[in-house]
A protein has these predicted regions:
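Short beta-to-alpha transition helix within the HATPase_c
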Residues: 9-26, 57
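Short beta-strand/loop element within the Bergerat-fold HATPase_c
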Residues: 69-81
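A residue-level detector for a conserved hydrophobic packing site
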Residues: 51-52
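Glycine-rich ATP-binding loops of the HATPase_c
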Residues: 109-116
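Conserved catalytic submotifs in the C-terminal HATPase_c
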Residues: 33-42, 77-79
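Conserved micro-motifs of the catalytic ATP-binding
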Residues: 2-6, 43-46
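Glycine-rich/acidic phosphate-handling loop/turn and adjacent ATP-lid/helix
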Residues: 82-103
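Conserved polar catalytic motif of the HATPase_c/GHKL fold
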Residues: 56-64
């Protein structure tokens, strides 16, 4: 499912996340408190269609863990290794959910790192490599 076009241009990660997550939140039957902590100027050169598909998969997994509602937080920052994106929720812990996204993540050159959140729920962190590193993976 594609939410954005122009796959190769650098784009705002905040705008991409907002465009992908908003429809999923509207479809969810229970109330979800969504917090987006991604600077508007933070960009990525990752393939937007593939990244959108990966975010959709991760957010759907999070929402499935919160049938009665909860909190979903997406945080992004720039690191020495690339752009880091974390999706955290107040659903069940890591051991209670499917964490297999190797093909979707490998397509954009990242490996998801899963961890339990101290307040409950789980988080997955993606490091989107800089464009040179992404080209080597492809």
């Amino acid at each position: 499912m594609s939410y954005l076009s122009n796959r190769s241009a650098s784009s705002s990660l905040a705008v991409l996340v907002e465009c992908v997550v908003s429809p999923l939140l509207r479809e969810h039957p229970a109330p979800i408190c969504f917090e987006l902590n991604v600077p508007l100027e933070l960009t990525t050169t990752a393939d937007r269609e593939r990244l959108s598909d990966l975010i959709v998969s991760l957010v759907r997994g999070s929402l499935a863990q919160m049938p009665e509602g909860g909190e979903l937080t997406v945080t992004g920052c720039l690191t020495a290794h690339g752009v880091e994106l974390e999706i955290a929720d107040t659903g069940s812990d890591v051991e209670s959910r499917s964490t297999q996204l190797s093909l979707a993540a490998a397509a954009i050159g990242c490996k998801p790192q899963w961890q339990n959140c101290p307040q409950g729920g789980a988080a997955v962190t993606l490091v989107l490599p800089f464009s040179d590193a992404a080209r080597k993976v492809a």
